[in-house]
Amino acid sequence: MEIKRFGRIREVIPLPPLTEIQVESYRRALQADVPPEKRENVGIQAAFRETFPIEEEDKGKGGLVLDFLEYRLGEPPFPQDECREKDLTYQAPLYARLQLIHKDTGLIKEDEVFLGHIPLMTEDGSFIINGADRVIVSQIHRSPGVYFTPDPARPGRYIASIIPLPKRGPWIDLEVEPNGVVSMKVNKRKFPLVLLLRVLGYDQETLARELGAYGELVQGLMDESVFAMRPEEALIRLFTLLRPGDPPKRDKAVAYVYGLIADPRRYDLGEAGRYKAEEKLGIRLSGRTLARFEDGEFKDEVFLPTLRYLFALTAGVPGHEVDDIDHLGNRRIRTVGELMTDQFRVGLARLARGVRERMLMGSEDSLTPAKLVNSRPLEAAIREFFSRSQLSQFKDETNPLSSLRHKRRISALGPGGLTRERAGFDVRDVHRTHYGRICPVETPEGANIGLITSLAAYARVDELGFIRTPYRRVVGGVVTDEVVYMTATEEDRYTIAQANTPLEGNRIAAERVVARRKGEPVIVSPEEVEFMDVSPKQVFSVNTNLIPFLEHDDANRALMGSNMQTQAVPLIRAQAPVVMTGLEERVVRDSLAALYAEEDGEVAKVDGNRIVVRYEDGRLVEYPLRRFYRSNQGTALDQRPRVVVGQRVRKGDLLADGPASENGFLALGQNVLVAIMPFDGYNFEDAIVISEELLKRDFYTSIHIERYEIEARDTKLGPERITRDIPHLSEAALRDLDEEGVVRIGAEVKPGDILVGRTSFKGESEPTPEERLLRSIFGEKARDVKDTSLRVPPGEGGIVVRTVRLRRGDPGVELKPGVREVVRVYVAQKRKLQVGDKLANRHGNKGVVAKILPVEDMPHLPDGTPVDVILNPLGVPSRMNLGQILETHLGLAGYFLGQRYISPIFDGAKEPEIKELLAQAFEVYFGKRKGEGFGVDKREVEVLRRAEKLGLVTPGKTPEEQLKELFLQGKVVLYDGRTGEPIEGPIVVGQMFIMKLYHMVEDKMHARSTGPYSLITQQPLGGKAQFGGQRFGEMEVWALEAYGAAHTLQEMLTLKSDDIEGRNAAYEAIIKGEDVPEPSVPESFRVLVKELQALALDVQTLDEKDNPVDIFEGLASKR
């Protein structure tokens, strides 16, 4: 099929690798492929360097030192697929070469020590933890550094905040008090800053010289009593203020203040914080702490420059500004590598504590590095992070786009981040610096709006964690091909033009250019422009970039369109959209859903499970295909060959399509012929009418795989057994089980069918005399077992596609304590579209299938072509997502011309171009009608007359010309399939790309007659998972009260809820065909009575004759 490209803006640079934020970050943290001597001091290398050497605390013993030399990662013990199958973590062993130095003798013992395992990242940027694919979401937080913010309580005054890395030191606030004293707040304690300045060695003259320009502000520092002290005395005074309970000793005070501001192991601004502080204060720091400790004295690094800036800001000196904390120059991304390294550092600190304890306990001669180190705390810290951290999430792999988007997510939540409740509007809002860095559209709709966002398409995260976006340099009005990646702070210094600025060759064509400076629009001459956007795509995320005609959609609906694409279920017969945006191929390639050739060669063999390619150098390389693999969300991930034996392939050519891809293009749904018209109220309120033809053609059929699991345990009564020998069951019920009691592959199973047979020993009840006699004769044989088999839950079923048995003792299998074996059964369902399923397009138009019409009842074109879907026109104007109408028009042209289109966002097909294509399509459409011997029907002419009155067509033209006029508006005359008559007005018809979403009615359908009850309230449980009932709440009770439906209401509150005796009696009566008896006392009333009695109130229940009634009588036996 021919693909026609729109778009005038040249691609200057390709998109960066879409999973780069994950893959690069983790590669840099581990540096596994870098020789030890060439490793940078980042990631786990830096963590080792910070923790080691570990010295013995008791200096009197002569002293042991454990030092670190290098580390290496071994090979992972199990491949990825085996890890998924056996619930293992895909990880590699970590070894460190350590040396133990005896300081007094100079003896050195060297050893390679095993330090536990570190999870490895798969090539697509996710992890396999306990058999499940997981993604570590990047976190956005306030960058460490020095910040100046207005004091909310006192206008005209400011607070200076010095912020370290999370959990790497205290926040410090400096402010000028109302009485003029400059105070410092640390660990919730306030004291005069002058005390610390004296400790740092400043005297009155130095401060007067450095800060003399700010006359009265400096007076707040001039405390004569403090300057009369020596720095050592000021230190003791400071210590007593900060630690009032501790004895004021010099060494204690030095150690405390050192740990607070000068110890690199306990206080860390981080590289980003150091960079921000230097940039803000215009200084150079020697390290990442606030002060140094040299020759027994503290030396200042940050405090005086911060104070100088605070005074200048208060005094209104030009060039000194407050900080915008939502500016992306002040927020940074903590990617996987950094998050893991933080946990690794915590684990190493625990390991070091253990080492010091063992140094004190063991005899020096017998100690070796291996005996000193216990790797458990390190491994536990890493395991905790990957399995339980808020940022370690179950990977969303509904389709390739959802897994790609998950890896590009940025969250402000998580440890050290914000909480939903605390985050205000400012943090959630779009900021001008988001341009090209964070997508302004894609974010969830609920409580997390604005806190969870997505990285823009071209954005990259630099080594300090700041997001950079690319710009082309412009020199003297000429656009060069030099591309510069800039942070938000750097960007603020320049004037930047848009990507669609008109160019002649490389020179800016317009005399006046719309550009932006510090996020504000300005109109400038071409010579004033310094940079230019590289592409209109750079503003939005990958998901949003997949919405054609995005520029015609309201942002709220674009947000829904972006989010719903990730909920699209992969279909059996996937189709790429007729109207694409140009990113579809890249998404499939970077998500690793499809398979591509690694070199030039020839296809040697193809079957359903593998492709073998013979490369130029003679090597035969086998590519195994993933067939019907269950994703985390239960969708089927399946790869299908797209090559034939003997075909020549070049490097990067497609070998096999993956889920939701067609010939390497992302295919999340289907192109269907849509009519936008009301239809007898069936498409009221976003409901959708579809043709039965879609079901016959399997257009919206998807495969879903459910996993069922059962364990056989050792119980107190005896071991459970997986067996075919189940008591009280007919042979028919066991026909699909193999001799071991596991269902056979290929069996069709329905609700209630046995998947795995299991027997458990019955609980011991007091045996009857007859049983005791039998046991004394036959021994233990008479003890019985009960059937506890795994059965298909209600409302589910399908075809068994795979079974897995994991037994204790099998290689690599780790089962929970007490579990002997685990059996898993995978059941696949083929789901056709049905009433209640949710459909959506890319523009945020979503709805539920309300009616499936026979194809003969659907409206059809004059040539008999029936439409597939009928959408309600009222869904468009108020939602302002007109992109879908333009897509439909272009889709109509594509339908008749047999073309596909690539229409990039903000640079796509314009109205005249669509009209030109529609004119060509009309010739094909009408030419075909003429060729089949019928031109314009007289009933069509009546519709055209009505169209004349509405001003849709020009009066006086021939019917054919009028039909063409309508066609250029994307409208045609439709006939009602039920009556054969034309529909009154012209209707917009065309191809629209519609997806079937993950919310399928089959998963939500649920019914209950009787079932489990809550232990306390005795009311039915809630929810499908618990096989619960529907809650009849307070407001529903009011509704029945308002109608006076007394008997229905009483039944709701008693028999159908928590009247234990009544419901049992009612059940019995229904079975026997008798009348349902009167209700008795509900359990909630008894609970109320008991609660009142617990409050020492004497509550009695009386009948109508005032006789006492015991509502608790005989209850124990009935429960």
From Swiss-Prot:
The RNAP catalytic core consists of 2 alpha, 1 beta, 1 beta' and 1 omega subunit. When a sigma factor is associated with the core the holoenzyme is formed, which can initiate transcription. This is DNA-directed RNA polymerase subunit beta. GO terms for molecular function: DNA binding; DNA-directed RNA polymerase activity; ribonucleoside binding. One of its GO terms (biological process) is DNA-templated transcription. Belongs to the RNA polymerase beta chain family. DNA-dependent RNA polymerase catalyzes the transcription of DNA into RNA using the four ribonucleoside triphosphates as substrates. It catalyses: RNA(n) + a ribonucleoside 5'-triphosphate = RNA(n+1) + diphosphate. It holds the Pfam family RNA_pol_Rpb2_7. It comes from the Bacteria. Keywords: DNA-directed RNA polymerase, Nucleotidyltransferase, Transcription, Transferase. HAMAP family: RNApol_bact_RpoB. The keyword Heme does not apply. One of its GO terms (cellular component) is DNA-directed RNA polymerase complex. InterPro entries: DNA-dir_RNA_pol_bsu_ext_1_sf (IPR042107), DNA-dir_RNA_pol_bsu_external_1 (IPR019462), DNA-dir_RNA_pol_su2 (IPR015712), DNA-dir_RNAP_su2_dom (IPR007120), DNA-dir_RNAP_su2_hyb_sf (IPR037033), RNA_pol_bsu_bac (IPR010243), RNA_pol_bsu_CS (IPR007121), RNA_pol_bsu_protrusion (IPR007644).
